[in-house]
Amino acid sequence: MLRPALVSALALSLALAGCSKTDASAPGEPTRIADTGSSQAASATGEAAVLPAAATSVREVGAPESSLVEMYLKLHQAPELSFKEARTSALLAQELQSLGFEVTTGIGQQWVTDKAMKDIGEVKPGVGGYGVVGVLRNGNGPTVLIRTDMDALPVPEQTGVSYASTVESQTWTGVDSPVMHACGHDVHMTSWLGTARALVAQKSKWKGTLVMIAQPAEEIGLGAQAMLADGLYERFPKPDYNLALHVSADAPSGTVVYSPGYAMANVDSVDIHVKGKGGHGAYPQATRDPILIGAHIVTALQSLVSRNVDPLDSAVVTVGSFKAGAKHNIIPDEAVLLLTVRSYDDDTRQMLLDGITRIAKAEAAAFDAPEPEITIEPDYTPSTYNDPAATTRVIKAIGKKLGTEYVREVNPVMGGEDFSQYARTEDKIPSVLFWVGAVDPAKYAKAKADGMPLPSLHSSLFAPDYERTIQTGIDAMSTAAIELFKD
């Protein structure tokens, strides 16, 4: 999943670069860093929170177990695309079984089969529902679910590392592509396994039921739906809390960043098929030009955010594709606009979708053209909402474990993540997702000092500082789980 930059240039990076004081936050970067024990203070008053003293050194992080390093390298070199995670899921299931979990595989199989038949009319070889659920019971207490995603991306790796992926495969819809773990899911899985090991080793510190799930197809926003539709909450212990982490490509390894409340956005895809009447470019009066109509739609759509969304709320309406015509002197019969729509609040989301429909139809009518065909993709990714109370508990515990100077609050982002689905059932289960910094601290400091961008998630150049990131993920997630088991 694509994530915008999460963290501003911390004093840590400036210290490493030889600077003695911090710069003001750049536009789009975090404007506040709240104390881990009072994450809601700033948002409640609308005032910026007081910045705590920043770290002046790189956090010391112990090396992960050598078997976990080997696991990471194995996963990175053998990435699998969405709904094709057969070997990956089998490996994770085997690891959970060795730890004493009750393990069930193939979660979501029927849903995936039905989806493939509906969308492309067939089930391609190797496509399936590869969800894994592991259950470990440890006396009476809360049930805590910890999720990892498994799928890689159709991206050619260009990192130059010795363990780079050279895998080529087909997407679940049949498109040939190179494959790379360009979004850190290999780190997620390794930290997830390390967390399972840590919690098994520390069973004396918690009571309850631990549910570890490995989810397919996060990158296409469908894996959580598949697992929930296959009875995740009915066939297995229903969680009292859900936890997940994600790497950050713009935070130094050894750190954790988080956003209470809305953390990530609703993600909708909308297609607008503009219908006109084609003809010769020299005689436009005899046509209904869909390119002109489409251009008016693109311009008018911008008023939705600027004049319909509360300035204190956030929303994005982006036209990512405008396709029409094939020759200089031919006015085509149609044009197609492809939109991505981002929001946090459900009411704002609905207002945007209604507004897109209204504007597209009105602009077509103004040109006396046929009504456009508007398709809103039903399988959207809902916004990720971090339960404030659970987030406060989790972050306070992580701050004690890592050191509060290495745990930072950041602004929510407009990226999407289908972990949100687990909190969207009628049970409204409190859920928390936090980010783990994945950039080598020295590289992070140099990039910030030089004003140079870092390789982003989904980039063919993204190569995380994997050992420090994996261990920080283990430390943070196992601490979070033990805290929530205290209920």
Region spans (language model):
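Bacterial N-terminal signal peptides
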Residues: 8-17
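Bacterial signal peptide processing site
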Residues: 19-22
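Divalent metal-coordination and catalytic microenvironments
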Residues: 68, 75, 96, 134, ...
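Metal-dependent amide/peptide-bond hydrolase catalytic core
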Residues: 51, 295-487
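Acidic/His- and Gly-rich active-site-bordering loop/insert found
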Residues: 48-181, 190-194, 198-207
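Bacterial N-terminal signal peptides that target proteins for export
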Residues: 1-8
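Histidine/acidic-residue-rich, glycine-tolerant segments that coordinate divalent metal ions
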Residues: 131, 170-180, 186-187, 199-318, ...
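Post-signal peptide N-terminal segment of mature Sec-exported envelope proteins
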Residues: 26-56
